[in-house]
Structure formats: C-alpha cells, structure tokens
A protein has these predicted regions:
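DUTPase catalytic domain/fold
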Residues: 1-171
Length: 171
C-alpha cells in the first residue's frame, strides 16, 4: 500500500484535478460528481444536492479522472463518516485495475434509516477514498488494452454493460 509521500510522487499527475489537501496518510479522498443514474435514468444534482433515500441505489461518479499506471492498482473505499450514516459507496466494484483511465463510477446505497443529502463538488465532504498498491512488476495486459475492458475511458455515472444482455436484466 502506498503512503502519502508515494501518492504524491506517483499520482500527482495522474489524478485530475489533484488537490494536495485530499492526500491522507495512505489514501486519496475523492469528490462526488454531479450526475446520478437511478433505474437507468440520468439525474443531475440540483442546488440542494441529491437525496438518496433509505433503501435506494444510485450510480454516481467522481469529479476526479484517474490514470492508473500499469504498475499500480487501487481499492475504492467509503469514508467512515458516511459509513456511520449508512452510506455504501460501492456494492462490489471497488477495484481499479492497472491501466484504467476515467472517472470512477460509484455504486451508492443508503442502508441507513434517514435520507442522505449528497453534495457534489470539490468543496463538499469527500464521498470516498482510493488506496493504492504497487504491483510486483508491470502488468502485461493493462486495462483497456484487450477486449472486455468495457469501462475504459468512462465518464459520468456509467451503468452496467451487462444490462445490454436481455437475459441478465429485465426492465
């Protein structure tokens, strides 16, 4: 796992925008973007933010665009202050592959008893954090190079590519 100093060294030119105050001892804090997807419908957060009701699931995205080198991977994790209110920032997709480039899609779920107001932007409380890992050597097939890299270069709240297969999802 990378320390704050290594995060500065490796990722200060690979996270856009990179804010030094977002670097933690072993992670980088991420900001919430303004686009949400609820049941496949795109919703922009208004001036009051986006309300995530109890039991509600929505896709969102980070403001930051990440460029992972072929020598590193990352884990997306929630922030404890949000977690204590019942917010999950990812359901199962918390891994960022070497070679990934794009905004990170968040899988938001409110497991708490109260509605949560989520405010997008760099001045709002961080929504999630990335911890980074150095690989033992550069990977031979970084994400985006081969077939199956469905989300390479994604921006915004990107939905599942599996829903294109009618036998997986029923609308």
């Amino acid at each position: 796992m990378l320390s704050d100093q290594s995060i500065f060294d490796v990722f200060s030119r690979r996270i856009h925008p990179f804010l030094p105050e977002r670097v933690q001892p072993a992670s980088y804090d991420l900001s919430l973007g303004d686009e949400f997807s609820v049941d496949g419908r795109s919703v922009l957060a208004g001036s009051q933010g986006f309300w995530l009701m109890p039991g509600m699931f929505a896709l969102a995205h980070t403001v930051e665009r990440i460029e992972m080198p072929a020598t590193h991977a990352a884990r997306l994790e929630g922030r404890s202050s949000w977690g204590r209110l019942g917010l999950m920032t990812h359901v199962t997709a918390g891994f960022i592959d070497p070679g990934f480039e794009g905004q990170v899609t968040l899988e938001l779920f409110n497991a708490g008893p109260r509605p949560l107001r989520l405010t997008p932007g760099l001045n709002a409380p961080a929504i999630a954090q990335l911890s980074f890992f150095a690989l033992d050597c550069e990977c031979a097939r970084p994400y985006g190079v081969e077939r199956g890299s469905h989300y390479a270069g994604q921006s915004g709240a990107t939905g599942s590519r599996l829903d294109e297969l009618r036998e997986v999802v029923s609308w």
